[in-house]
Regions:
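Gly/charged, well-structured mid-domain segments that form the phosphate/adenylate-handling core
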Residues: 80-87
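Active-site core segments that coordinate phosphate-bearing ligands/cofactors
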Residues: 1-39, 45, 50-61, 65-68, ...
Length: 245
């Protein structure tokens, strides 16, 4: 994500490297290039890199001009769903695949997660917790948060005719909080699988117990405040380890 600012850093700090760049690619674009030999990208990918102007429905010329980027650095744009190339002979041999298989889809991790959960329409939300926690909601209008507390990307089914934007709220401390709970709720030792089974014993909503997982430093969603992690709603004679897990 945020490829534009990373590219600007390279341009300023490693100009010799910047001058050698032919095309910029997200990881998915690079993998597709290795599979097909074709360099291309998608609107969804460009929006994750902050290169897309939703009002103009084009590469963000104002941003390219601001950073002094040449438009030629942007790869050809292909539909998120549609033929983006075919597996070439080299990749087929390396991977044991049949040459000529079409590559027809690519997207980032959170749009992919939303796709897997059938989240496509305004008001629908996908949530996941891993290294970070993410709440990803689909919006049907072009707008943004002027405080940059959330990120807005083109969702996998976004088109010029049908606005479908993924609004991404990232909670950075979720993964490490899971590790903290593992170490401190059951210091005698417990696996993550056992934690999941223990948590399944609690009712939905954990009888009012909630954990604010902000123990990993400042959070952009809170305007860079450091609030710390806290457990709320716990009642000593009611709640058990299952609720906290």
């Amino acid at each position: 994500n945020f490829t534009a600012s990373k590219l600007a850093w390279i341009k300023e700090n490693e100009p010799a490297v910047y001058e050698r760049i032919y095309k910029i690619m997200l990881p998915g674009d690079y993998i597709a290039m290795k599979l097909t030999g074709d360099i291309c990208t998608t609107v969804s990918g460009l929006s994750e890199g902050m290169f897309w102007d939703f009002q103009a429905n084009d590469v963000a010329g104002f941003l390219m001009d601001y950073y002094g980027f040449d438009r030629s650095l942007i790869a050809d744009i292909k539909p998120t769903f549609g033929e983006q190339g075919r597996v070439n002979a080299w990749a087929a041999k390396e991977l044991g695949l049949k040459e000529g298989i079409p590559v027809t889809y690519r997207a980032g991790d959170q749009p992919n997660n939303a796709l897997s959960l059938n989240v496509f329409n305004p008001g629908e939300i996908a949530s996941t917790a891993g290294t970070s926690g993410v709440v990803y909601g689909v919006n049907g209008e072009v707008n943004y948060d002027p405080k940059s507390r959330v990120n807005t990307f083109a969702h996998v089914n976004h088109t010029a005719e049908q606005t479908r934007l993924g609004v991404l709220l990232c909670i950075n401390g979720t993964g490490i909080l899971n590790s903290w709970v593992k170490r401190n709720v059951a210091p005698e030792g417990i696996s993550y699988s056992d934690m999941n089974r223990l948590a399944a014993q609690a009712p939905v909503g954990s009888a009012g117990v909630s954990i604010l997982p902000f123990g990993n430093g400042a959070e952009r969603m809170l305007e860079n405040k450091e609030t710390g992690c806290s457990i709320c709603g716990a009642v000593s004679y009611t709640h058990l380890r299952a609720h906290e897990t």
